[in-house]
Amino acid sequence: MKLSLIRSMTRSAVFELENGLCYRPAHPFTVQLNGETVYTACETNVFSLFSLLPGTPYTVAVQAEGETLTLDFTTEAETFFVDASRYGLVADGTTDNTGKLQAALSTCPKGGTVYVPAGRYRTSSLFMKSCTTLYLEKGAVLLGDNDRTHYPILPGVIPSENEVDEYYLTGWEGNPLDSFAGLLNITQVHDVVVTGEGTLDCDAQNGDWWINQKVKRIAWRPRAVAAVDSENVCLHGITVQNSYSWTIHPIFVKHLDLLSFNINNPYNAPNTDGIDPESCEYIRIIGANIHVGDDCIAMKASKVFLGMKLKKSCAHTVIRNCLLDKGHGGIVIGSEMSGGVKDMVVTQCLMDHTDRGLRVKTRRGRGNTAVIDGLVFRNVEMRGVKAPFVINMFYFCDPDGHSPYVQCRDAMPVDEYTPKLGSLTMEDIVATDAQFAGCYFDGLPEQPIERVSMKNVTITFDPNAEAGQAAMADNRPNVKKLAIYAENVKEIDLHNVKITGYEGERLRFANVGHFEED
C-alpha cells in the first residue's frame, strides 16, 4: 500500500491511497495534515484537502490497515488573491451576478486565484482566462440562469478571411453547430484550475432545458462546463449538478485533469452525460463520483465531418478509482467517434446499476478514421449492471440510424465510411447480478472486431433477471441471462472466464475466427 500525490494546486491538493481496490478501501482510514486530524473515516481511495495556503510545505499522514503512511508536499505559488465578493456579488440566489463574476475572472492577474465565498449566486455564462484559478468555497453555489435568452450563442464555425480555414468554437453531439455557451467556459486558454468544495448548479429542472430536448430553440443546449481548444486544464473537488445537457464537455483539449469531484443529474434528465471528452489528448479522470441518467463517461471524437477532416482522436486516457452510478453506460466509447479513440486504460472503477458497463457503440457512416484500438479495462467491479460488456457496431443513432445502410446484417463494401474496432483487453473484472447478457459483441460482417481478450473475469447473473436489449440495434431480440454472444469477431481469447447463472448455451458464436479458451 502506498500514498501518492495526484496533484497539488495553490489552495488544495488531491491524493490517492494505492491499495489495488475499486474506488473504496477495505476499511475507512484517517487523514491528518501537519498532525491535525482532517478525516476520521475516509471511505474513498482518492481524497482531497482544501483551504490550504499557497506556496506552503505540508505533511499528510494516513492511518490505514494498521499502517501509517506519510507524504510531504508543497502547494503551488499564488501571485494574487481576488475575493469576488469585493466586486459587489449578491448571494441571494436571485440577483444576476454574471457581470460581477465575469469582472472578477477577467481582471484576475496572471497566476492569481478568484475566490468565491459561500452563498448562492445566480449567473449565466462565465469565461475563464489563462493562468488563473477559480476557487469555490464550501457552500458557494453558482446557480444557472433559467432564461435561455440570457446566454450567449457561440457559433459552431467561424470562417477565416481566406474562406478556406475554419475555427470550430463549439458543437452539438459531434457536429460544429451553434450552441449556447456553458455555465462555465474554458475556451482558447491554458493553465486553468477550477477547484474547491463549491457547486456549479445549472438549475436546469427549473428552466425549459429538459422540455422537448431534441428541438433546437434559438441554439442547441449548453453544457455545464465547456472547454474548447485549451491546454493544461484541471477541474477538482467541485460538484456539478442539474446540467442542461452533457455535463463536462471538453473539445480539443490537451492535458486535462478531472480529479476527485462529483456529478449529480436526475436519472430522467435527457442527454445529461457525465463527462464527454471529444478529440482530447492526455486525460486523467481520477476519483470521480458520477450519478446521471445517461452515459457516465463517454469518450468521443466527433462525427464524420470533423472526424475525417481534422483526424483528431481521443487518445492517452487514464480513468481510475471512479464511481459510476445509475447511468446508461459506465465507460462508453462513442457513438460520435469518427476521429478515433485510442490508448485508454480504465482501472479500479466501481460501476453500480448502470445499464451497461464497458460499452462501445459505433455504426456504418462514422468513417475509416473511426478507429477504436488499444483499450484496456482492468480491475473493475460491477454491481447490478444489466449488460457488463457490450460492443455494438449497429448502434441506431442519428436520423438515419434505422436505415438499411446502418442496420443491414449482410456484408457491405468496405469504404471510406466504414469504422474499425481493433484490440480490447478486459482483465480482473467481477460483475454480479447481471441481467441481459454477460458479453455481447456485435461486429460488422465486412469489418469484424479485430480482437477481444478476457482474463480473470467473473460474471454472475441475478436469479430474478428480466429480459431487455443488450445493444441498441434493430432486429435484436430481448435477451435474459445470455452468457457470451459474439458475431463478426476475428479473434476471441478467454482465459479463466467464469460465468454462472446463465441460461442456454454458454457460447453463441457466428462468424468468429480464432477462438481460444482455458
Region locations from a protein language model:
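Extracellular/periplasmic carbohydrate-active domains that bind, remodel
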Residues: 1-518
